[in-house]
Curated annotation (Swiss-Prot):
Presence of the UniProt keyword Nuclease in the record: no
Membrane-protein topology: Single-pass type I membrane protein
Source organism per UniProt: Homo sapiens (Human)
Name this protein carries in UniProt: V-set and transmembrane domain-containing protein 5
Subunit structure: Can homooligomerize through cis interactions within the same cell membrane.
């Protein structure tokens, strides 16, 4: 086999070098990106419940994680932190938020006003970022209303039972009183008849 001319060897070497450089650049760009996974994009909850807004991310280095809340009442920042450091929690959510190193947060004792959109932004130190949204619906606890109605009905039933018992007792007393009165009337009538007989 004849050796290739030196010009062809150079172009083949350059093209292989360019190919290797492109592969390395693609791998480098891929490793610098941020990926974010949200297992549950919509959460339904009831009042006073503790809610976990669960996410997972992957990136090189330590990112900055930020959660914001958006609803009919406006948009506000909830918390910002870097995993392994102390979180900067807003005043509106002090003592109501717990952060996790995987980017998740837990909201304690949610209310109807907590319904809305929760947006997480994960920003890598080189500037690339990724965001995701979780929708939270918080509804009133229906059984509390039913409990209130049940208590009122039980109270009314107890009052009705007491009234019926009082009516029964009053009826018995009235019956005894009438019986006594009839008996006295009978006695007085008998005495009158006897007196009339004696007078005659």
């Amino acid at each position: 086999m004849r050796p290739l001319p030196s010009g062809r060897r150079k172009t083949r070497g350059i093209s292989l070098g360019l190919f290797a450089l492109c592969l390395a650049a693609a791998r480098c760009l891929q490793s610098q990106g941020v990926s974010l996974y949200i297992p549950q994009a919509t959460i339904n909850a009831t009042v006073k419940e503790d809610i976990l807004l669960s996410v997972e991310y992957s990136c090189h280095g330590v990112p900055t994680i930020e959660w914001t809340y958006s609803s009919n009442w406006g948009t506000q920042k909830i918390v910002e932190w870097k995993p392994g450091t102390q979180a900067n929690i807003s005043q509106s959510h002090k003592d109501r938020v717990c952060t996790f190193d995987n980017g998740s947060i837990q909201l304690f004792s949610v209310g109807v006003r907590d319904s809305g959109y929760y947006v997480i932004t994960v920003t890598e130190r080189l500037g690339s970022s990724q965001f995701g949204t979780i929708v939270l619906h918080v509804s009133e606890i229906l059984y509390e209303d039913l409990h209130f109605v049940a208590v009122i009905l039980a109270f009314l039933a107890a009052v009705a039972a007491v009234l019926i018992s009082l009516m029964w007792v009053c009826n018995k007393c009235a019956y005894k009183f009438q019986r006594k009165r009839r008996h006295k009337l009978k006695e007085s009538t008998t005495e009158e008849i006897e007196l009339e007989d004696v007078e005659c």
